[in-house]
Amino acid sequence: MRLSSNWSKLQDGVTKKAGKKRIDKKPHIIKKVGQDKKPKSKIMGMIYQMNKEIDQQKENKKVGKKFEFTETITEIDTVETTTETKKDANKIGKYIAMDCEFVGVGPEGKDSALARVSLVNFHGNVVLDIFVKPRETVTDWRTWVSGITPDHMKNAVSFKQAQQQLSDILKDKILVGHAVKHDLEALMLSHPKSKVIDTARHLPFRQKYAKGKSPSLKKLAKEILNMDIQSGQHSSVEDARATMLIYKSAKQDFDKEHRKKFH
């Protein structure tokens, strides 16, 4: 991980590959995991927990109660063959998913400035979740979609501090994101392409869900995870967790495609 040239100038951001399967008489339909029933498979554990939190967020919104996503996923998925184990689920690990939230700056708030960045590990547990003070004057908080208010800036870190923290954590890690290039540009950071997994650029997803274009994270979460996200105010923690789950749902395909490209 290194600072981009732009930042330097400023110093004077599980399903396996589908093979041929026996066709059952009844089509298999993935249903949203209910809250009154524990998930039957390990991969659904994290989705189960996230759906509980999303539903709780909706209930709290109705009564005007503030809600934040938990830092730890209680239902841990360890089905993947990685060096991480259930015991190590809170460690940073090899894989990091990132998502950012932005506020509006400039005339009519049309330009975007970083205001929050969240990182989760392979198991969806929060590694970092910080609010960032925009360097420009905020002209539109975009609270209705970003969930960010002026109050969040009371304990926010400076852009430079956020950048340094991200740089330190992401060093030598595999970064998973959705249209992650934009987040890195907002942070004025670069990351080796060989260590970046972008769910928005995965060809099978583009072909299946977006007619060759880049599918939205919301679309992928609904189609692949049967999970409704971004229904109101966004949460970068929620989005980072969804991104990691989407990667894990087709991890073998992602990794195979990645090896072909960089090895």
Curated annotation (Swiss-Prot):
The lineage of its organism: Eukaryota, Fungi, Dikarya, Ascomycota, Saccharomycotina. The gene is REX4. Residues 17-27 have a biased composition (Basic residues). Its EC number is 3.1.-.-. One of its GO terms (biological process) is ribosomal large subunit assembly. Pfam families: RNase_T. Residues 95-247 form the Exonuclease domain. InterPro entries: Exonuclease_RNaseT/DNA_pol3 (IPR013520), REX4_DEDDh_dom (IPR037431), REXO1/3/4-like (IPR047021), RNaseH-like_sf (IPR012337), RNaseH_sf (IPR036397). Exoribonuclease involved in ribosome biosynthesis. Involved in the processing of ITS1, the internal transcribed spacer localized between the 18S and 5.8S rRNAs. This is RNA exonuclease 4.
